[in-house]
């Protein structure tokens, strides 16, 4: 995932990595470590798909160039909510990376979307 971020943006153009809870956090931690960048978390809630908020216990995203990391993209609702939350907090979302993209989408809310694996029905 860090290699994808480097190929798409270059290490110097990434300030903060955002991991979507729960499964995206471990991937985001490793990407942030490799990139030597800050990290924060988008915490999902039980209120329904796509609900959640940015954690205030980690790095802030205001004025930062952000890469979002998650494990699986299915409907894209949680990723869209994450993008909206980062933008509302003053961050610039440059790229979204997932381990498995279960859609045919290559962007989401005008943000490039990259998946290490694409799994769609044929």
Model-found features: residue ranges?
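PRPP-dependent phosphoribosyltransferase catalytic core
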Residues: 83-122
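Active-site-facing substrate-recognition patch
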Residues: 1-9, 13
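Short, glycine/charge-rich flexible loops or terminal/linker lids adjacent to PRPP-binding catalytic cores
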Residues: 27-67, 77
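Conserved acidic residues
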Residues: 15, 64, 94
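Solvent-exposed alpha-helices and their adjacent loops that cap or buttress functional pockets
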Residues: 10-11, 58-62, 88-89, 106
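A contiguous pocket-lining binding segment that forms or flanks enzyme active sites
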Residues: 61-91
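Short glycine-rich phosphate-binding loop at a beta-alpha junction
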Residues: 11-21
